[in-house]
Amino acid sequence: MKIAIDAMGGDHAPKAVVLGAMKAIKEYSDLHITLVGKEEEIRQYLTSEERITILHTDEKIESTDEPVRAVRRKKQASMVLAAQQVKDGVADACISAGSTGALMAAGLFVVGRMEGIERPALSPTMPTVDGEGFVMLDVGANVDAKPIHLYQYAVMGSVYAEKVRGIKNPRVGLLNVGTEGGKGNELSKQVFAMLKDAPINFVGNVESRDLLQGVADVVVCDGFTGNVALKSLEGTALALFSMLKEQLMSSFTSKLAAAVLKPKLMVLKDKMDYSEYGGAALFGLKAPVIKAHGSSNDQSIFSAIRQTREMVAKEVIPTISSVMEKEPLQ
């Protein structure tokens, strides 16, 4: 199995990418990795070249670049070349912690959209209080969506949850303003009616306040709603940890309490740590394309590689394609 990785994407590239790649190589004996980027910079952190290949390029896509224009004009950019490796059949999948918009453009224009899928979806795995997490899609690939798009998201998310996350008969929920069937806007009502008859375990509407309680294994929504929900959850978690730290450091007594509570607090932190869940998959493409978090450290990159490897090994893309071919709504 071969995975191409944009070594220059992300806040801590290429160090985090190289270290994460070496960690993955040690863990998985069947894995080969191509690091795409500036060879001189990559070699500063590369201590072993076992099953690791460097594809040199001086060009990269910057966060300030307009995504579509950058992908079309910067043909030799590390992200574009990683995607090209997939298109050419040299790699089975690709990963980047670079610009989300650029990676979506590279996925569409270079890797290509899966036949029958109208709109790809960006799907991270979000943490829950029980540590199991849930798949959420879409969180920003498409801010405007039609009922058929959300229907397809539900099917793709269900396949992923079962194949990669090992959840038997995963529960699929529709993010809405209430749990009753008649709630929401016209889009939500139409999607609800469609999902009731879908070949998935649809559990109905779910509210954003219940997401972290693990009410569903797959949560479906349009990209605008999903992005707002995602950033609200991230912001709330950061604020709570910040307030907790401030209070625990406010006096000598509270500092003593913090020392006693530290092991439990670390368990809580690990449960809510995005780095353990891998990256956000771009569903609806011809091959796995994974968006790692922009601030990924080496553990985050390792988790994204582990996730990508599972997608390839469990044949997620062929399974989604097969399921979609059988669907009467295409």
UniProtKB/Swiss-Prot annotation:
Assigned keywords, A-Z: Cytoplasm, Lipid biosynthesis, Lipid metabolism, Phospholipid biosynthesis, Phospholipid metabolism, Transferase
GO cellular component terms listed in the entry, alphabetical order: cytoplasm
Complexes and interactors: Homodimer. Probably interacts with PlsY.
What processes does the entry annotate via GO biological process terms? fatty acid biosynthetic process; phospholipid biosynthetic process
Q: Which NCBIfam families has this protein been placed in?
A: plsX (TIGR00182)
Q: Which cysteines are joined by disulfide bonds?
A: none
Q: Which HAMAP family match?
A: PlsX
Catalytic reaction equation(s): a fatty acyl-[ACP] + phosphate = an acyl phosphate + holo-[ACP]
Q: What is its EC number?
A: 2.3.1.274
Source species taxonomy = Bacteria, Bacillati, Bacillota, Bacilli, Bacillales
**Compartment annotation:** Cytoplasm
Q: What is this protein identified as?
A: Phosphate acyltransferase
| Gene3D superfamilies tied to this protein | Isopropylmalate Dehydrogenase
Q: What does this protein do?
A: Catalyzes the reversible formation of acyl-phosphate (acyl-PO(4)) from acyl-[acyl-carrier-protein] (acyl-ACP). This enzyme utilizes acyl-ACP as fatty acyl donor, but not acyl-CoA.
If you read the UniProt record, what top EC class would you report for this enzyme, in one word? transferase
The similarity comment for this entry is: Belongs to the PlsX family.
InterPro entries cross-referenced by the UniProt entry: FA_synthesis, Phospholipid_synth_PlsX-like
Quote the pathway field: Lipid metabolism; phospholipid metabolism
What GO annotations for molecular function exist for this entry? phosphate:acyl-[acyl carrier protein] acyltransferase activity
